[in-house]
UniProtKB/Swiss-Prot annotation:
GO terms for molecular function: 4 iron, 4 sulfur cluster binding; metal ion binding. [4Fe-4S] cluster 2 binds at residues 187, 243, 395, 399. This is Probable cytosolic Fe-S cluster assembly factor CG17683. InterPro entries: Cytosolic_Fe-S_CAF (IPR050340), Fe_hydrogenase (IPR009016), Fe_hydrogenase_lsu_C (IPR004108), Fe_hydrogenase_ssu (IPR003149). One of its GO terms (cellular component) is cytosolic [4Fe-4S] assembly targeting complex. Component of the cytosolic iron-sulfur (Fe/S) protein assembly machinery. Required for maturation of extramitochondrial Fe/S proteins. Transmembrane segments: none annotated. Keywords: 4Fe-4S, Iron, Iron-sulfur, Metal-binding. Belongs to the NARF family. [4Fe-4S] cluster 1 binds at residues 23, 68, 71, 74. It holds the Pfam family Fe_hyd_lg_C. It comes from the Eukaryota. Gene3D superfamilies: 3.40.50.1780, Fe-only Hydrogenase (Larger Subunit), Chain L, domain 3. It comes from Drosophila melanogaster.
Amino acid sequence: MSRLSRALQLTDIDDFITPSQICIKPVQIDKARSKTGAKIKIKGDGCFEESESGNLKLNKVDISLQDCLACSGCITSAEEVLITQQSREELLKVLQENSKNKASEDWDNVRTIVFTLATQPILSLAYRYQIGVEDAARHLNGYFRSLGADYVLSTKVADDIALLECRQEFVDRYRENENLTMLSSSCPGWVCYAEKTHGNFLLPYVSTTRSPQQIMGVLVKQILADKMNVPASRIYHVTVMPCYDKKLEASREDFFSKANNSRDVDCVITSVEVEQLLSEAQQPLSQYDLLDLDWPWSNVRPEFMVWAHEKTLSGGYAEHIFKYAAKHIFNEDLKTELEFKQLKNRDFREIILKQNGKTVLKFAIANGFRNIQNLVQKLKREKVSNYHFVEVMACPSGCINGGAQIRPTTGQHVRELTRKLEELYQNLPRSEPENSLTKHIYNDFLDGFQSDKSYDVLHTRYHDVVSELSISLNINW
């Protein structure tokens, strides 16, 4: 299992929807019935042996993403990509091959290597190595450059665009009274659950706006490729994310461009995998060069490279859209920081805007599978929608506590670690999505805001996945 992503290891399923009770590919092992049981032991090399029957070595099971087509458990994607294509081993292989091609001047096969860093992994690595957040981003640039990266970017511009698209989508739906409650779509674990468990019921309510990762894929494979005059297929785009499900999101066929013969994101590695790479290199992050992140989008660099979006920890969707809708629909300018009211637990919160004693906006944040289940049941029971918008994330505490974030190393409780990361996030500068750069991208590359082109590349669609089970097996996880 060392060759595979840790997404298949049961110890790392914190960020996944609770696994389905039925596996679509239980491996059948033919064996004679025995009156006595057998013990299985794990050898030093990781192999399994049936120890009381002559030390019989057991065969390793290989599972691809396609095998897990209809599973809503640890692997949740319908794409036909082996999981080894989303591993640090595959990344190192590509980087080594590219380095050899450069050395031999085989320019036809040299690829431009682009890394994109999400905010949450930067925070996780900054805390792990006890360095400042901006310095952590700069050290990561130095590290990835040492591996052969040509560009190292942040998701800041994609985060901004995602909020601009999502807020406009909400206002349009609200004014047309269509498909409300609107549900956020940036969490791939939640989207996969919606597709495979509640299909036709939930999907009309899910926002069509792409996640920042996939918007970044468009920016890199189309806009940056045009700037460099390089075909998209000659760019290898790697993202660093806080959650394993982002690997599966990148593997969706919806995010493969037939015109460019290329995926928007070729490989996803996670915070914990970066930590493993640094451990294997036997050199802490702080010992790599301090290099500013690249900013190929305009001539003017922002003052900072790592930004927060509102107070909430998963992109700021609920807070930002609530403020925008209040101002543009009800002429209420909410300049103060919003306070969400905690309901049954800290991962289910809501906020209400009233005018003349009437509730005109009601938003919620639902993190974690328990709250997602409660939300879905609530939506099913109500004939008239109770919420206008819900920010939904599969992980308790949201993306800051993604299952691929670095775990505590000194006996520290995960909640304490999450609180420390929250403090780092709250101290980041706040980004205002409607800025000169996003306007420049819309006007110069996307034919303007709300154009047909911008909708085509910044929005996606979802699929009602129907499971046809040939074998049923109950599993207790």
